[in-house]
Amino acid sequence: MENSEKLANSKEVIAYIAERFPKCFILEGEAKPLKIGIFQDLAERLSDDPKVSKTQLRAGLRQYTSSWRYLHGVKPGASRVDLDGNPCGELEEEHIEHAKATLEESKAKVATRRKEQAKKAREEAKAKKTARAATPPKRRPQPAAKKVEQPVETRALNADEITVGNNVSVNMGKGNMPATIVEINKDDVRIRLSNGLQMVVKAENLRS
């Protein structure tokens, strides 16, 4: 059983009638001018066809005859054809001029529309470029400047300042570190650093 579902749009209608009447309707290349009154012939031939209605046929035929392919085919020397491709007389000058004017008008509309679309695209691109230029780039935060520690001025201890329990500074090469004297043995002095570490240093390395 054949599928009797109706065709969805004019494009499908044109493809269908081109399949049914290939000598009349052409899908590729220059189309042939159609017989005047061909709609009635088409409606009669397809009156019992459940896939297409008269309204669909009229819309499909209108789209087919307004295409650039069809209008190009309406020219001097061309003959109209019926559904079976049989010649039905040459075109009249009036119809040729009308087709020519319609084609030129259609092409002009397309050219104008494309020009407007191109202009709109340029304006949108320009607007985006302007928006990007107006937005300042995000600045990266500058690293905080390292605080330069000023060296603490110290002096050598006097002999009477080298006593057990006295808080002193000891020169450790990388700088002076706080310490406490815990034992004295002539020039050797045992000290305890702030971290609890004990060590023996020369008295001359102790500072106040």
Curated annotation (Swiss-Prot):
GO cellular component, one term: cytosol
Localization of this protein: Cytoplasm
Chief localization: cytoplasm
Signal peptide start-end: none
Biological process terms in GO annotation: post-transcriptional regulation of gene expression
Bias (Basic and acidic residues) ranges: 106-127
GO molecular function, one term: RNA strand annealing activity
Pfam families: ProQ, ProQ_C
SMART domains hit by this protein: ProQ
Region (Disordered), start-end ranges: 106-154
Record's keyword annotation contains RNA-binding: yes
Keywords associated with the record: Chaperone, Cytoplasm, RNA-binding
Role of this protein: RNA chaperone with significant RNA binding, RNA strand exchange and RNA duplexing activities.
NCBIfam families: PRK04950.1
Family named by the database record: Belongs to the ProQ family.
HAMAP family associated with the record: ProQ (MF_00749)
Protein's name according to its UniProt entry: RNA chaperone ProQ
Organism: Aliivibrio fischeri (strain ATCC 700601 / ES114)
Gene: proQ
